[in-house]
Amino acid sequence: AKMEGSRLDTVKKRGKVICASRNDVPGYGSLDASGNNVGFDIDLCRAVASAVLGDPKAIEIRYILASERGPTIQSGEVDMLVRTVTWTTSRDAQWGNYVQTMFFDGQGFIVNKSLGISSALELKGATVCVTQGTTTELNLQDFSNQNNLNISALTFEDTDAVVAAYQSGQCDAFTNDRSQLAALGSAFDKRDDHIILPETISEEPLGPVVPHGDDQWFDVVKTVMAVLVYGEAYGVSSGSVPSSATGDTKVDRLLGIEGSYGQESLGISQTAAQDILKAVGNYGEIYDRNLGPGGINLPRENGR
């Protein structure tokens, strides 16, 4: 049901932030050996919990399919959707408020080397596996039509099914955002038998989405994302969060040591940025831990 009144108050009373995400793509949202939710998208949820509740563990992750993303955020039953969600104007109008692009991705293709091709333009008449209810599916159709490739799409509801179909040879190629291809490909038994083709056929700006109808909550989540980015820009990392004046006006303002960037107007604590950065680190730390050297080892090109 849609929430009456302030979502921030509701979250504080509830004592946790509810995020719709996933557990099937390493780097973005998966389970570690102990069964904990980990990943880039999960850390964005933890950052919000740190800011609002002072506790990065005060989260509930609800796993949803790609095709369930719109209805889930429209219903207002979750506080935030963080599930590799591409910003589009129609989704922004119909689903919820896109907060900020936190990763710039682009769609690509992975194929088995035995197919003997080196370009996506050679996929004439091919069968390509893709997830339902995604921009990926729409882009594939556009790419096929534009280049007269007559590609057949084989669609599945969830990523695991797409990967299984590709690995069992039901399709010639598998298409997804390039970072997800790298992540999922890293888990293949014979990784070296597969190549990601050079073409990037779309722009995929990924970021969190919040329900329509609560500007305060939208602003809070936007501010949390900004803290991650500015923390890195100002050289503040999880291991070096000062609690007394540094003499650097911008750092002191961000950390709530001196001055303000408007925390009190938003209803978050003066030192919320300290809580966020201590708990999850800055943008670069989150990237490196999940998508970079500590995770799926994706080079940080135009990531943010």
Cite the ranges covered by each PLM segment:
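Bilobed "Venus flytrap"/periplasmic-binding protein-like clamshell domains
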Residues: 18-27, 37-52, 86-87, 104-163
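C-terminal functional modules
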Residues: 251-304
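Sec-exported extracytoplasmic/periplasmic mature domains
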Residues: 12-16, 49-57, 74-78, 114, ...
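Short helix-initiation/N-cap motifs at beta->coil->alpha
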Residues: 4-5, 59-71, 115, 153-168
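Extracytoplasmic small-molecule ligand-binding "clamshell" domains
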Residues: 2-5, 10-81, 283
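Solvent-exposed loop/turn segments at secondary-structure junctions
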Residues: 24-27, 66-69, 80, 86-90, ...
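Extended ligand-binding regions for polar small-molecule ligands
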Residues: 1-2, 42-46, 50, 113-117, ...
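Acidic, polar ligand-binding/catalytic clefts
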Residues: 46, 50, 54-122, 181-200
